[in-house]
Amino acid sequence: MYQGEFGLNMKLGYGKFSWPTGESYHGQFYRDHCHGLGTYMWPDGSSFTGTFYLSHREGYGTMYMKTRLFQGLYKADQRFGPGVETYPDGSQDVGLWFREQLIKLCTQIPSGFSLLRYPEFSSFITHSPARISLSEEEKTEWGLQEGQDPFFYDYKRFLLNDNLTLPPEMYVYSTNSDHLPMTSSFRKELDARIFLNEIPPFVEDGEPWFIINETPLLVKIQKQTYKFRNKPAHTSWNMGAILEGKRSGFAPCGPKEQLSMEMILKAEEGNHEWICRILKDNFASADVADAKGYTVLAAAATHCHNDIVNLLLDCGADVNKCSDEGLTALSMCFLLHYPAQSFKPNVAERTIPEPQEPPKFPVVPILSSSFMDTNLESLYYEVNVPSQGSYELRPPPAPLLLPRVSGSHEGGHFQDTGQCGGSIDHRSSSLKGDSPLVKGSLGHVESGLEDVLGNTDRGSLCSAETKFESNVCVCDFSIELSQAMLERSAQSHSLLKMASPSPCTSSFDKGTMRRMALSMIERRKRWRTIKLLLRRGADPNLCCVPMQVLFLAVKAGDVDGVRLLLEHGARTDICFPPQLSTLTPLHIAAALPGEEGVQIVELLLHAITDVDAKASDEDDTYKPGKLDLLPSSLKLSNEPGPPQAYYSTDTALPEEGGRTALHMACEREDDNKCARDIVRLLLSHGANPNLLWSGHSPLSLSIASGNELVVKELLTQGADPNLPLTKGLGSALCVACDLTYEHQRNMDSKLALIDRLISHGADILKPVMLRQGEKEAVGTAVDYGYFRFFQDRRIARCPFHTLMPAERETFLARKRLLEYMGLQLRQAVFAKESQWDPTWLYLCKRAELIPSHRMKKKGPSLPRGLDVKEQGQIPFFKFCYQCGRSIGVRLLPCPRCYGILTCSKYCKTKAWTEFHKKDCGDLVAIVTQLEQVSRRREEFQ
């Protein structure tokens, strides 16, 4: 029965309606729906007073029950947002609600996972929260354009017209909005009735709201709260404090809140039975989180309690729920599995330490009890435990040792090896799983192992009960642990009650070997947890704070980790933020040292989309030279360089930008073979070897880094050795003779490199632009080499006898290299000129050189009747035929034949001795023969 206002033959306005079941409602109506403020009562005495939306509870309201009172936000008849449930004893359950359960508390768990405890990742945290906006929900966009939509048809446009969505006056036939489409215009009418005489929720007034937690459900809750932010209940009930995680203004915790907090702590402890009982009785939600978004699932996963993880997921926990910092349970496990200490140094991120000089004198390390105080986390990078079961101890670098003092020991073995746990010789050769079991005095493998495992409980490095009946220190023995020994020690330690050392643990429980075994066990357990989360649907692409989990596995060089993530759909088109050069996983993998980098690159290339993706480091400079070079003393006088007939012109300029993965691999100096293998993989997948970064091509980078294997691979795979480089680098031949990179290879290797470049098509006659200040000139690679040579004025200009022995060697090496390049240039000129008519070329040279030279010295003239200018003169390259220079020198022709040019008396004499003595006579004979022919013609005429 209805009593109230009508309109359009429908309930419209204020009224009261009761049902035969005893339920009743009095409040506002709109089009036969309970819509607006009102009170709904049930036969059992419970009632709800608040906002209704199309006959559903939505917005802030108060739910009165027999023994409880709830005040909070609703949506579609369900609790959906901040709320407070009050009990008769005065306690209150405060937090964010979803249906009948708390899903986020206002209390923070002290032991929760937080990125604030990992300052090494602070530079990666560049993510800024998005701003909450409701206007986007009201927009109905067309989507794809007509040309892009493969299923475009004209009737699609009707879907955007509210007048065509429903028949006219549809309310006459039905008002059941649950089964009818909701048009945009009708939704605006409904919202206008709800927010009558109030600021519309779509008007962004006051300070902006930012999304606190990016979990999809919590984003919807935050938007729902933002929509009703101007309601009086939002302020009077202190709902804003709940969103901010502030609980100080409320009564003591109620039962649901207490159980939720305790369940998070029990998940950390691994109390499966207690959590199972709570979830079975529905006392708490499996998806509950503390004030910072630290969920029960995250607590169980980070502590490797896989049984609880399975239980929570079976009970509906969201495996991809994020914390307020943006971390999922999977990303937390990856951050623990790959600490920053496990990351490999690489050239992509510029994390390779600068080489340090070794100590001049041996250092004797001082062993003390502090050696035993290393925490468990530091062992993550000392013990490398791949997921498939192969183990390798990788001790950190240690100081040099003095020669060992030989001595004797009784019985060939120790009576008490309790010190072995704390005195394993980290300074000896690396302890690998495939190494011999024991070297030196420990001959019996099994007995030695039992002694190690058994006697560690009787004595340690600092124990007063240690007995060592030998005059030889344990440090004097080189002990290598095999895979079997590590597995057995780890198995024995797995029986310990404590999974990790605690502050109350005695000193012998902190032994190095024991903690290594515990670390191995914990890593294996966490690896199983990671695999479980991925198998249960964890998204490896969801979390980007501090970085995507694929980056963690790549940076740590874990092949199995990368393979696992790729098998579960990890994206490879991700990158760092612009502040970190937008590096991709392929960039970092190409720079990883060791065989792991090769395998990871191969895995990524099978899933990669753009092998030539560029980093945003186009403004960076490739390691400036260690030499403090002054401006070159070589004078530039706008020399034109070689004529165009001597070289082939470039068809297109190379593309320049940030580093590609190929640049990363070619820049490496750590492992030539692995770098070569990575380059081969990249090229086989279509990497472009002719892109520039910082003026360098991959070929010039490999030359600068001294990797001959990569140079050979690039040239074999079609890299262009004549690619013009920018930023004053010239070409690959110029880089080969640059002083900045001369320390990368010896003299024989430099000469072999030049030969290899020329044999693969490098043109030493290619013009090279040289600039210094406002002056410039065009020369060749030889001129570039001399230009750089004269920048080191100490060696280039000082008298030879005043140089130090090392400087003399440097001077001679540089001169030898430049002379060899001059030889190659001369041979290239001769090879090019051999394609032309030698007589005509010689006449052209004489025609151009004789007039300029006769101003100073009278010489022979051309035969009469041979006017070169009228018949077309061949432009020839003017350079010193001995040293190869064409810039900054004064060139003079041979006074006898005018066939060559030299720059100095030294070059003239040396050229005469080495090659020109014979050629000069031949050229003079040509002139004599031409004169005779010319004379005969004159006599005949």
Curated annotation (Swiss-Prot):
PANTHER family associated with the record: ANKYRIN REPEAT AND MYND DOMAIN PROTEIN 1, ANKYRIN REPEAT AND MYND DOMAIN-CONTAINING PROTEIN 1
ANK repeats: 292-321, 513-542, 545-574, 581-613, 657-691, 694-723, 737-766
Binding site for Zn(2+) 2: C894, C897, H916, C920
Positions annotated as MORN repeat: 2-24, 25-47, 70-92
Entry protein name: Ankyrin repeat and MYND domain-containing protein 1
Gene: ANKMY1
GO MF, one annotated term: zinc ion binding
Binding site for Zn(2+) 1: C880, C883, C903, C907
Keywords assigned: ANK repeat, Metal-binding, Repeat, Zinc, Zinc-finger
Zinc finger (MYND-type) stretch: 880-920
Membrane-spanning residues: none
